[in-house]
C-alpha cells in the first residue's frame, strides 16, 4: 500500500521557501564519554576465574542429569537455570530432559507443575496444547503460585488460544497482593510478573535481578548460585571489551562531534545488542549490530531534526541509487552520514552477494523516514493504517534483523534470503512490537519536538478517543502481536537458524525493556541508566 498522502495534502516544499533554521531535538550529551569507557576495569577478564567456573559447570551437569529426580524437581531446576542466565551452558542436557518429559509425562494434578511444564516446553519449541489446563484452572484458584505460573505461561499463547487469556489470572493475582499475610517470595514474583511478564523481559537483566532474588531463597543451591554469579561477571567482562571496541570505532567516525543535533547514545546502542544476543561467543555480532544501531540513530535524527525536505529527498535518492552524485547539494554533515554508512556496508559485506540485501534494507528504512518527513512538513496526520504500514519499517527492526541474519547464518540459505528480502513474519512482528513499544514510551517527548504523530495520536484522531483509550488500544495491539510472534517462532516451516529467531524475539523483548519507563534510548532516563550500570559496569560480589 502507498503510505504517502495524496498530492492535495501537501504542496511541494522547496529549500527556498522553507525556514532553514534547523530544528533541535534538545538531546542531552552522553552520560558515558570515551575516556570513561576505555578506563573501565573488570577483574573477571582473562582466564583467572575459568578453572573454578569449569569445575562448577561439570558439577552442575551431574546434578542436572542425576537419576531419581522427580519430574517437577527437574522442571524447577531448568527454570532456575534459565532465570539465572546459565541455561545456555546446558542446552543438550535440558533438551534431553524436556524431550523425555514430553514423551513420557503424565498429567499433573498441580496447576503450578502443569503451568511450569507448559511454559518450558513451549519456550523450547515443543508442541503442547492448551488443553493441558482443562479442568485445572477453575479448581485451583487458591493456589497463588499456580495462578502466577499460569499467568506467566499465558504469554506464550498463540492466536485463538482462549484458555490462556490473562485477564482472570491477573485479577486474582492483584487481589492476592492486597492480603497482609502472604509469602513475600511469591509476592515479589507476582509484583514483577504484573509489571512485565517473564516472556517479555530482557534475558540478561532478568538474570541480574533473579540472582539477587535467588540468593535469599531457602531452597537456594549454593553450587548453582556461585556458578550464576561467576558466569554473569565473566560474560560482563567480555561485553566490556566489545563496548571498548565500538567506542573506538564511534570516535573515529567523527559523527558525534560533527552532528551535534543527533543523539550520541553509543552505550545505549550497545545495551540493545546485549538484549538481542548476550552470549559471550557472539562478540562480533554485538560489535557490528552496535554500529548498525548507532548509524540508525544518527540517520533517524538527520530526517527527524536536521534536514529540509529537499535535502532529505536528495539523501534518500543517494541511498536508493548508492550514487555520490546525489550528494552535491547536501550539507557536509549529511555527506559524512552517507559515507559512514557506505563504508560500514562495505566493511561488513565480505561477500559481494550480501551487499544488495544490506543496501535494500537501508534503502527501505530511508524511504520510510522520507515518508514521515513529508507528513511532518505538510502537517498531515496519517490514518492508523497508513501509519502502521510505514512505521514497522521506520522503527529500523528490519535493518537490524537483516544484518543479524548474515552475522548468524553459516552458510547462508537461498530460501532464507527470499524470506529475508520480503521481511518474513518473524521480522515483521518483532518490528511491530518494537514500533508500538517505542510509541508508548516516546510519543509525548517526540510531539513536543514537533515530530510526526505516532500511533497513539493517529488512533486518537481517527477514532476520536482520549489519549488513555488510545494507549490502551496500543497495549492490546502489543499483546496480540506477541501472539503472532509466538506463532511464527513455533512454525517449523522457515529456513532461519534458531539463533536468528531467538534474536528476533529478543529484539521485541528489548523494546519492552527500553521503553518500559519512557524513552530509555534518547531520553537517558534514570531507570535505563541504572539498568546499564547493573548490567555493564557493576560486577556481582561473590556469595
Swiss-Prot record:
Cofactors: Mg(2+); Mn(2+)
Q: Which reaction does it catalyse?
A: (2E)-geranyl diphosphate + H2O = (S)-alpha-terpineol + diphosphate; (2E)-geranyl diphosphate = sabinene + diphosphate; (2E)-geranyl diphosphate = beta-myrcene + diphosphate; (2E)-geranyl diphosphate = limonene + diphosphate
UniProt motif DDXXD motif: location:
300-304
- Give the region (Disordered) as residue ranges: 1-22
Q: Which domain of life is it from?
A: Eukaryota
Query: SUPFAM superfamilies annotated for this entry?
Result: Terpenoid cyclases/Protein prenyltransferases, Terpenoid synthases
Q: What is known about its subunit structure?
A: Monomer.
Give the protein name, as stated in the record: Terpineol synthase, chloroplastic
* Species this protein is from: Nicotiana alata
Q: What is the gene called?
A: TER
Amino acid at each position: 500500500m502507498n503510505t504517502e498522502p495524496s498530492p492535495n495534502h501537501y504542496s511541494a516544499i522547496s529549500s527556498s521557501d522553507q525556514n532553514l533554521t534547523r530544528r533541535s531535538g534538545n538531546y542531552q550529551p552522553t552520560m558515558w564519554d570515551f575516556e570513561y569507557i576505555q578506563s573501565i576495569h573488570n577483574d573477571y577478564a582473562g582466564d583467572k576465574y575459568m578453572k573454578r567456573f569449569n569445575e562448577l559447570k561439570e558439577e552442575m551437569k551431574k546434578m542436572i542429569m542425576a537419576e531419581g529426580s522427580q519430574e517437577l524437581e527437574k522442571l524447577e531446576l531448568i527454570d532456575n537455570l534459565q532465570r539465572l542466565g546459565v541455561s545456555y551452558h546446558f542446552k543438550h542436557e535440558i533438551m534431553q530432559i524436556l524431550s523425555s518429559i514430553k514423551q513420557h509425562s503424565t498429567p499433573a494434578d498441580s496447576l503450578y507443575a502443569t503451568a511450569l511444564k507448559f511454559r518450558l516446553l513451549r519456550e523450547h519449541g515443543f508442541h503442547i496444547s492448551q488443553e493441558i489446563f482443562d479442568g485445572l484452572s477453575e479448581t485451583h484458584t487458591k493456589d497463588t503460585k499456580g495462578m502466577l505460573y499460569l499467568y506467566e505461561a499465558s504469554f506464550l499463547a498463540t492466536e485463538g488460544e482462549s484458555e490462556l487469556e490473562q485477564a482472570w489470572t491477573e485479577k486474582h493475582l492483584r487481589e492476592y497482593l492486597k492480603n497482609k499475610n502472604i509469602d513475600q517470595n511469591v509476592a515479589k514474583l507476582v509484583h514483577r510478573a504484573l509489571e512485565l511478564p517473564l516472556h517479555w523481559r530482557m534475558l540478561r537483566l532478568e538474570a541480574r535481578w533473579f540472582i539477587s532474588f535467588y540468593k535469599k531463597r531457602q531452597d537456594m543451591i549454593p553450587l548453582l548460585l556461585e556458578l550464576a554469579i561467576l558466569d554473569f561477571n565473566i560474560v560482563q567482562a567480555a561485553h566490556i571489551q566489545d563496548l571498548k571496541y565500538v567506542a573506538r570505532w564511534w570516535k573515529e567516525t567523527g559523527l558525534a562531534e560533527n552532528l551535534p543535533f543527533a543523539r550520541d547514545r553509543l552505550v545505549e546502542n550497545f545495551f540493545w545488542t546485549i538484549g538481542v544476543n548476550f552470549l559471550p561467543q557472539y562478540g562480533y555480532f554485538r560489535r557490528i549490530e552496535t554500529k548498525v544501531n548507532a548509524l540508525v540513530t544518527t540517520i533517524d535524527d538527520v530526517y527527524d531534526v536536521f534536514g529540509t525536505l529537499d535535502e532529505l529527498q536528495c539523501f534518500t535518492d543517494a541511498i536508493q541509487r548508492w550514487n555520490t552524485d546525489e550528494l552535491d547539494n547536501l550539507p557536509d554533515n549529511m555527506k559524512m552520514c552517507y559515507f559512514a554508512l557506505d563504508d560500514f556496508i562495505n566493511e561488513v559485506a565480505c561477500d559481494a552477494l550480501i551487499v544488495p540485501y544490506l543496501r535494500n534494507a537501508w534503502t527501505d528504512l530511508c524511504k520510510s523516514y522520507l515518508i514521515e518527513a513529508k507528513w511532518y512538513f505538510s502537517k498531515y496526520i496519517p490514518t492508523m493504517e497508513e501509519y502502521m504500514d510505514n512505521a514497522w519499517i521506520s522503527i529500523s527492526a528490519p535493518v537490524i534483523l537483516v544484518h543479524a541474519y548474515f552475522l548468524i547464518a553459516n552458510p547462508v540459505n537461498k530460501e532464507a534470503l527470499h524470506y529475508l528480502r520480503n521481511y518474513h513474519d518473524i521480522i515483521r512482528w518483532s518490528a511491530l512490537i518494537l514500533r508500538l513499544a517505542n510509541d508508548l514510551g516516546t510519543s509525548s517527548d517526540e510531539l513536543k519536538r514537533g515530530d510526526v504523530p505516532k500511533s497513539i495520536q493517529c488512533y486518537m484522531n481517527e477514532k476520536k478517543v482520549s489519549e488513555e483509550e488510545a494507549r490502551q488500544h496500543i497495549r492490546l495491539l502489543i499483546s496480540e502481536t506477541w501472539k503472532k510472534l509466538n506463532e511464527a517462532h513455533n512454525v517449523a516451516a522457515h529456513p532461519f537458524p534458531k539463533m536468528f529467531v531467538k534474536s528476533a524475539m529478543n529484539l521485541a523483548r528489548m523494546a519492552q525493556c527500553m521503553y518500559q519507563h519512557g524513552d530509555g534510548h534518547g531520553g537517558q532516563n534514570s531507570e535505563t541508566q541504572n539498568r546499564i550500570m547493573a548490567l555493564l559496569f557493576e560486577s556481582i560480589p561473590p556469595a
